[in-house]
Swiss-Prot record:
3'-to-5' exoribonuclease specific for small oligoribonucleotides. It is found in: Cytoplasm. The active site is at 127. It comes from Mycolicibacterium paratuberculosis (strain ATCC BAA-968 / K-10) (Mycobacterium paratuberculosis). Keywords: Cytoplasm, Exonuclease, Hydrolase, Nuclease. Residues 5-170 form the Exonuclease domain. Residues 196-215 are annotated as: Disordered. Its EC number is 3.1.15.-. SUPFAM superfamilies: Ribonuclease H-like. This is Oligoribonuclease.
Amino acid sequence: MRDELVWIDCEMTGLDLGSDKLIEIAALVTDAELNVLGDGVDVVIHADDAALAAMGEVVTEMHSRSGLIDEVKASTVDLATAEEMVLDYIRTHVKAPKTAPLAGNSIATDRAFIVRDMPALDAYLHYRMIDVSSIKELCRRWYPRIYFGQPVKGLTHRALADIHESIRELQFYRRTAFVAPPGPSTSEIEAVAAALDEGKDAPGPSDSASAPPTG
């Protein structure tokens, strides 16, 4: 098992594996300190008019607002090409298959579409997954102060932007939830969230549980 994490986010025409299409996939690899390695990759995949017309009203509005529908129509990239582009980037930073876990938010949904449409990519990833959404739900139940203090999400519903937000969210939990009791004060939680919002504070060894915040 390697320390790197492979972050993937997908945009689809819906959540039905039987009929909906994968129309965007992005990937970033991070090291053990959640630093992004390389530039990542973001690929918009072509879908025909029938697939786009079959989208529900909410999904259509979401992908129209983000500009994704227009990009999907203009794209000439098919699933096989997109899969190879993502694998090329991942292989640059993760040399051996089945050694780096998949990470993201509600990542099981994304992986289901990857299994269906990009089996070579799925096979390269370790079977383990790190789902930031699970940490969020645990904090909501056990550490509500941390849950309600988390950084605000942009909700762009574009794959690469969503990954950056997921990484930032895990940075936040690392520095507020994964520390020794009693954990950070409300003001310290707010300071961490503000620093991450401004993008000026990268995670590092000093963020570990060996030096818990006081208060």
